[in-house]
Design a protein with these regions (language model features):
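Active-site-adjacent "gating/activation" loops or surface patches in catalytic cores
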Residues: 314, 318-340
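An acidic- and aromatic-residue-enriched active-site/binding cleft used to recognize and process polar
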Residues: 9, 29, 73-76, 99-101, ...
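Short alpha-helical segments and helix-capping/turn motifs at coil-helix boundaries
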Residues: 6-14, 79-84, 107, 252, ...
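Glycine/tryptophan-enriched, flexible segments
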Residues: 157-300
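Beta-rich, aromatic/charged-enriched effector core domains that present basic-aromatic interfaces
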Residues: 79-224
Length: 340
């Protein structure tokens, strides 16, 4: 059997691995939920985000004529279960997007080799740079600097660059203008309220409370986009209601308002419902039409093409080194209070 394999953070529109000639398996990979080899007590709302968004994505693909199957996390709890899945389905060929996860890639490579499965690797739309572009920039460097990387990205992508090849407004970064205190009389837009009538919301909560009892947090205040429509709505509402003042109060904090003028788009971007290219293009287009201040536009763009891509690069070339070292020789666990 030839299959398209999709992971919980690869719910892209469009998805490069999709083909109606292949069965689509959406894998509730344990690395994202409850892995036995690398046990992690993820927050219950992260678990909920994955389970609900996978179900929505599967339903939509089925409506579009794809043959989609969800492989429940209970079927793959240990690394050897990968092999059982591929064997039981007589998989001979796999099309998959770069998981950008060392453990997942290692497990896939192992089973591909052992079972002699032909694999087709696709760069992920979840980042702007390809895997090769990241390697070309980071591999031969001994030190890494965000500022240098960010300026290179701006030039390469021709974002906020004038006809002379210089930064629009005269500065590469307006970070110094992103630090205003929140005035007492400032009007904060109300948070988006997502609804979940079309998903199995109640049963998902019961499933999480039953199977993830020891995980941190609760599902009570869950309010994240779980499908493409909700994610696009979140992007549009940020641009219309918060973008204007995002820059000035980017670093502000409030005991009353959780998000202030922030977009809260990271969850949707990190599971593929929005792509960084899409968010950057939308913000640039909106700014052209609505005269968004440069400190808001540049500050927002910097988070995506600067910080997000930069940290992805560090993970790709130094992730294993960082994960397996303990420079400060710490021995104590992180307190539970950090997750409350």
């Amino acid at each position: 059997m030839k299959i398209s394999l999709i992971l919980p953070h690869q719910l892209f529109y469009p998805n490069p691995v999709l083909s109606r000639s292949r069965t689509v398996f959406i894998l509730e990979d344990p690395i994202f939920l409850n892995d036995k080899e690398y046990p992690t007590r993820f927050h219950k709302q992260k678990i909920m985000l994955h389970l609900l968004s996978i179900k929505c994505y599967s339903d939509e693909l089925n409506e579009y004529g794809y043959n989609v199957k969800i492989l429940d996390s209970s079927a793959i709890k240990a690394p050897n279960d990968y092999e059982s899945f591929f064997k039981s389905n007589k998989v001979s060929e796999v099309h998959y997007v770069d998981p950008h996860d060392f453990i997942v890639q290692k497990r896939l490579n192992k089973v591909f080799k052992k079972l002699r499965i032909k694999s087709h690797f696709y760069d992920t739309p979840g980042f702007i740079n390809t895997k090769d572009e990241i390697d070309d920039y980071f591999l031969n460097k001994k030190k890494f600097f965000l500022t240098t990387f960010y300026q290179k990205e701006r030039k390469k992508l021709n974002i906020l660059i004038n006809h002379e090849g210089k930064p629009v407004g005269g500065k590469w970064s307006y970070d110094s203008e992103n630090r205003k205190k929140l005035p007492k009389n400032v009007k904060i837009p109300p948070p988006i309220k997502n609804t979940y009538e079309n998903v199995d919301f109640k049963n998902t909560i019961e499933h999480i409370n039953s199977n993830f009892k020891q995980n941190y947090g609760t599902t009570d205040s869950f309010n994240y986009p779980v499908n493409r429509s909700q994610a696009k709505n979140a992007l549009n509402l940020f641009l219309e209601k918060r973008f204007l003042d995002f820059g000035s109060y980017e670093d502000a904090i409030s005991t009353e308002h959780r998000f202030i003028f922030h977009s809260v788009l990271s969850p949707a971007m990190n599971i593929g419902l929005l792509t960084p290219n899409e968010v950057v293009s939308a913000s640039l287009d909106f700014s052209d039409q609505h005269s968004i201040p440069i400190n808001s536009l540049e500050g927002f763009i910097r988070q995506i093409i600067g910080w997000r891509e930069f940290i992805r690069g560090i993970y790709q070339v130094k992730g294993v080194y960082q994960r397996t070292k303990n420079h400060w020789n710490f021995t104590k666990k992180i307190p539970d209070e950090f997750y409350s």
